[in-house]
């Protein structure tokens, strides 16, 4: 642990997913004893629960959360009187721990999360009582594939693939999102990033959506709309039945398949009130039973699996030397998905495997990161960072951008997207005043997903933070400059501007987006 975290005694990692969520925790005195929570409302055993809240009619109070909120009928008599789960769990295990002082929270986020979205998550963590203040240093973020990579790094031992320089691909296939990253094993059990992290929304829940679309074709779009609107819990119960009976056991081998009989009269009798007369007559002939055949289920999978395979291919095209591929996340347990991935890439990657309990790989990896943040040595930037400069206007520059004194505001690049940076690496540049009588210099930091930018107001360029320094030595005229330095830390950027004339330094920090 770093010196700034000397008070930390317990690390708690939270994998807050779009479909399922979980948490794990450990005491720094016993880092090998990782505990993954498996006790949830209405469930005992699963390492995650559904990311669902059910509110009362006024949308003020949470009545149910987790699995009961998703697939059970609402009851006005049922109240959610349980204590906040994470706090109560840690308080019970270590009564002497002061939560706000001694607990470090590691929160996982999807790879595509922007600074704005991370800020929203931080604000939610504050409102949920996980941190004492919005500026607390006891909350850190890590991307889901990076956390999974840390967990899978240990899995390399099983294949004797622990040589320094070994590259491996992490494919985190969750319920909602799929995130990928290629990492390189460095000395001292550290990790470096080789390619930009990529991701898309094509996780396991999209197979569920294909099932709902299939059902809509059978009972009518209008009936499905009414079912979603007024009986969402019943619909989700049907989805769970589909998952249990058809989705989870599906291997892609027709010999293993048994026709799934969806009995609407038993599972969803309310549909009788929603279907039109023509559909009702047809379903009555079928005795309200819809047969779901092999080709039906395969079609539900294939559109989603195809998108995942394209994401994997994109990562492997960017890194020709990849020794292993690890599949993690809840949907990675799909036998059909694993089969398709192995068939597609077995000639390119010699090791295609999953670690123990792949559904918990992200949350356990996040916990390992919290216990030793130095495990991540380098990352690849997904943003270009720069400041607004004011050089002389040149022939060919837009006339409408010329200032009255013959200058032009430009985006001055400090470091470009796609570059690999070590944690705590410094990037510096010398910047000069634009006017002889200038009293201060604006060092506002801008970011863009583009590799290059000309102006700070062009589409895609966003202001990350404001930063101004004083330049009192006006007698030096234009012969004044500052050394502007960005230090890329674990979770934030530290900006330093040093006046070269008087040696005075100015500092500020910005939240870092390596995602």
Tell me the role of every PLM-derived stretch.
Residues 14-20, 145, 163-179, 183-186, ...:
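A short acidic Gly-Thr/Ser loop motif
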Residues 110-112, 146, 199-342, 390-398, ...:
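Gly/charged contiguous loops adjacent to phosphate- or pyrophosphate-bearing nucleotide/cofactor binding elements
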Residues 29-127, 207-256, 272, 427-428, ...:
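Phosphate-binding loop and its immediate beta->loop->alpha context
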Residues 187, 266-307, 314, 374-515:
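Acidic low-complexity intrinsically disordered segments
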Residues 1-84, 140, 190-191, 197-199, ...:
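Early-domain small/polar-rich strand-loop-helix modules and first-structured segments
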Residues 130-147, 339-365:
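Conserved phosphate-binding/catalytic loops in two-lobed NTP-binding clefts
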Residues 1-9, 136-171, 190, 360-377:
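Conserved phosphate-binding catalytic cores of ATP/NTP-utilizing and phosphoryl-transfer enzymes
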Residues 119-124, 332-348:
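Conserved helicase motor "Helicase C" RecA-like lobe of SF1/SF2 P-loop NTPases
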């Amino acid at each position: 642990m770093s010196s700034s975290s000397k008070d930390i005694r317990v690390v708690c990692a939270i994998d807050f997913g779009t479909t399922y969520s979980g948490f794990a925790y450990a005491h720094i005195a016993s880092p090998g004893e990782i505990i993954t929570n498996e006790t949830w409302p209405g469930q005992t055993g699963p390492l995650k629960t559904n990311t669902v809240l059910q509110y009362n009619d006024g949308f003020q109070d949470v009545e149910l959360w987790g699995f009961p909120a998703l697939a059970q009928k609402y009851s006005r008599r049922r109240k959610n009187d349980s204590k906040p789960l994470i706090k109560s769990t840690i308080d019970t295990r270590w009564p002497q721990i002061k939560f706000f002082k001694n607990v470090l929270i590691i929160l996982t986020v999807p790879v595509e999360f922007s600074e704005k979205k991370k800020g929203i998550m931080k604000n939610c963590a504050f409102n949920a009582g996980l941190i004492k203040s919005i500026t607390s240093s006891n909350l850190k973020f890590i991307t889901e594939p990076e956390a999974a990579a840390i967990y899978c790094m240990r899995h390399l031992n099983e294949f004797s693939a622990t040589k320094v320089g070994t590259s491996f691909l992490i494919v985190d296939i969750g319920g909602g999102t799929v995130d990928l990253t290629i990492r390189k094993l460095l000395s001292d059990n550290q990790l470096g990033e080789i390619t930009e992290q990529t991701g898309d929304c094509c996780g396991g829940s999209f197979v569920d959506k294909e099932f709902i679309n299939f059902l809509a074709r059978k009972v009518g779009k209008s009936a499905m709309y009414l079912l979603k609107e007024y009986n969402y819990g019943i619909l989700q119960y049907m989805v769970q039945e589909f998952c249990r009976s058809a989705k989870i056991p599906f291997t892609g081998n027709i010999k293993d398949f048994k026709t799934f009989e969806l009995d609407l009269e038993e599972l969803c009798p309310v549909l009788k009130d929603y279907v039109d007369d023509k559909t009702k007559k047809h379903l009555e002939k079928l005795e309200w039973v819809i047969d779901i055949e092999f080709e039906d289920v395969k079609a539900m999978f294939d559109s989603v699996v195809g998108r995942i395979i394209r994401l994997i291919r994109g990562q492997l095209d960017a890194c020709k030397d990849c020794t292993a591929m690890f599949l993690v996340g809840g949907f990675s347990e799909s036998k059909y998905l694993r089969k398709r991935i192995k068939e597609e890439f077995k000639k390119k990657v010699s090791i295609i495997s999953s670690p123990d309990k792949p559904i918990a790989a992200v949350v356990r990896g996040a916990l390992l990161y919290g216990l030793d943040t130095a495990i991540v040595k380098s990352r690849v930037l997904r943003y270009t960072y720069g400041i607004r400069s004011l050089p002389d206007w040149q022939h060919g520059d837009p006339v409408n951008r010329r200032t009255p004194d013959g200058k032009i505001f430009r985006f001055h690049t400090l470091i470009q997207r796609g570059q690999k940076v070590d944690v705590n690496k410094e990037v510096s540049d010398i910047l000069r005043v634009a006017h002889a009588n200038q009293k201060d210099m604006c060092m506002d930091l801008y970011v863009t997903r583009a590799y290059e930018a000309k102006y700070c107001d062009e589409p895609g360029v966003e202001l990350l933070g404001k930063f101004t320094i004083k330049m009192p030595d006006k007698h030096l005229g234009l012969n004044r400059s500052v050394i502007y330095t960005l230090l890329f830390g674990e979770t934030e950027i530290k900006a330093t501007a040093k006046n070269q004339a008087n040696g005075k330094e100015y500092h500020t920090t910005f939240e870092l987006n390596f995602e």
